[in-house]
Amino acid sequence: MLIGDKPLYYNGNHIEVEQNDNIYQDVHNKLKVAFDNLDEFLFMYDDIFLLKPYEIAYYSDIKFTCRIKRTGGGRKEVMQRTLDVVGKDALNYELHYPMYFKKFDLPDDPICPKTIMGNIVGNPTQVKDCKHNAQLVNEKFLQGMPCFSTYSEDERFKTILEKLYPKPSQYEI
């Protein structure tokens, strides 16, 4: 089941969630719907394409407390609420990687959900963020367009997709 924004090509089960202009509230609203409908799920953003079964929790090489010091505004408030839940020694899981989720007590206000989930699960693997290090292909998933800045990289992405998936899947229109 897909919750949130639906790509044009997808024709499987879907629950639409109205978008919010505030990105943190938008993600929070989608998580609420997921928690109301599922006990466990794979949390990821719309620019990820899975290549294999996936259950690993990745955390950043940048500490969560360091991230808070380098940010401001609404994001800083969300990060501080997260720190209040997980504690000052929390590992930072806010990366552009999919993450396996199990239902947990979701606070009323937006938080950094992957950091809360990651600090609950344990057994993480430390990595650099693929988006900020322009890593296109991971052995388990493919990072989409936000990693790219030029047309030639977009073409490279399309070529990789065509090699990986020469035939349309049952979920494509």
What are these regions (language model features)?
Residues M1, G12-I15, V121-K128:
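Structural alpha-beta junctions
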Residues R70-R156, Y165:
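Catalytic core and acceptor-binding pocket of nucleotide-sugar-dependent glycosyltransferases
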Residues K6-Y9, D21, I48-L50, E55-I56, ...:
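Short, solvent-exposed loop/turn segments at secondary-structure junctions
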Residues D39-L51:
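Short beta-strand-to-loop acidic/aromatic patch adjacent to the donor-nucleotide binding site
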Residues N22-A34, F157-E172:
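Extended catalytic core of nucleotide-activated donor transferases of GT-like folds
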Residues L50-R81:
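Conserved donor-nucleotide/metal-binding helix-loop-beta segment in metal-dependent transferases, i.e.
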